[in-house]
């Protein structure tokens, strides 16, 4: 019994110990475990809820993605259709451009080919025509017939309105023209009573005075300046030239300084002009006018053909005496020249200023012809004209210009046929060579 009680007490003590110290921790552990299970269950429930929400959101996202994908697909299809249409339009436009450009290129190539064919054919035609013409005009009778045909055409021309002038008055203003007219009038009265020797002296003296005025600008200014009282200028002339020049020269100089000149240089022009007239009147008195005119025109053509000689004779840097020496050398090399023509050319070279030598000599030649009341026609032909052709040409030109015309003929075989006529500033070109040249010029490039 005692054992049983002892065991019971021991059991009770064990129970007490268990209840006191073992059960509470175990109970606490169990509560904690339960709480942990509860929390785990709550978390599980929350996780399940979140999972459900996530599934819902996923489903929604999928739907949204499908909708967006459908929209993008639709827009892409629309863009692709639009791009396709644009590319098609661009392709059509580019095709049209290439087509038009190709057509234009074809047209340009066609035109170029046509031009080349025309140019080649035209050149060959002109060349063949030139050969035919040259063969034709190789016969003197045929060549003469081309001149006759041109004279027929010239005969039908209306009267020309050309105004033909010559001499120093060409570039003078009104006051100087009037002054020159008075001086020439005085010269005519002096020349009536002068013999050829007096005219030669007069020409030499006037030429010397012109050279002096040309080198002394101050003297020229005093003698040419306009003034109401010319007595002072006359006294100056007498002091300078008294006893050094003849009376005729002094009278002409007094008349010259008494006039009103537009510019100072016109006085020199007038004195030179009268010096030329003195020599031309001398040529008339001695019956050498035509010879002088012909030699002047011939020398003018020489200067036209030799530009370097023309430049040297007019070069102001070269002293006048050296230019005159060159002139005499050229004249002597040509077999000599009429003394009056030589004197006229010497005057011109000594006093040349501001003009080319060929122009100055041509003006001198025209003055020589104009002295006889004629105009000068410079005619270029392929061969010499017959007397009948020359006479007819003179008559036709005289009728056209309303004044007697003097013919100066130059033979140039390159003219081929017809005539090239220059009267003053007017040119009548009826040469075959110019017509062939015009045909070449008219060919397409």
Curated annotation (Swiss-Prot):
GO terms for molecular function: proton-transporting ATP synthase activity, rotational mechanism. The keyword rRNA-binding does not apply. Coiled coil: none annotated. The chain crosses the membrane at residues 3-23. It is found in: Cell membrane. Keywords: ATP synthesis, Cell membrane, CF(0), Hydrogen ion transport, Ion transport, Membrane, Multifunctional enzyme, Transmembrane, Transmembrane helix, Transport. It is a single-pass membrane protein. Its main location: membrane. It holds the Pfam family OSCP. CDD domains: ATP-synt_Fo_b. One of its GO terms (cellular component) is plasma membrane. Gene3D superfamilies: N-terminal domain of the delta subunit of the F1F0-ATP synthase. F-type ATPases have 2 components, F(1) - the catalytic core - and F(0) - the membrane proton channel. F(1) has five subunits: alpha(3), beta(3), gamma(1), delta(1), epsilon(1). F(0) has three main subunits: a(1), b(2) and c(10-14). The alpha and beta chains form an alternating ring which encloses part of the gamma chain. F(1) is attached to F(0) by a central stalk formed by the gamma and epsilon chains, while a peripheral stalk is formed by the delta and b chains. In the N-terminal section; belongs to the ATPase B chain family. In the C-terminal section; belongs to the ATPase delta chain family. F(1)F(0) ATP synthase produces ATP from ADP in the presence of a proton or sodium gradient. F-type ATPases consist of two structural domains, F(1) containing the extramembraneous catalytic core and F(0) containing the membrane proton channel, linked together by a central stalk and a peripheral stalk. During catalysis, ATP synthesis in the catalytic domain of F(1) is coupled via a rotary mechanism of the central stalk subunits to proton translocation. This fusion protein includes a component of the F(0) channel (subunit b) and of the F(1) subunit (subunit delta). Two copies of subunit b and one of delta together form the peripheral 'stator' stalk which links F(1) to F(0). This is ATP synthase subunit b-delta. It comes from Mycolicibacterium vanbaalenii (strain DSM 7251 / JCM 13017 / BCRC 16820 / KCTC 9966 / NRRL B-24157 / PYR-1).
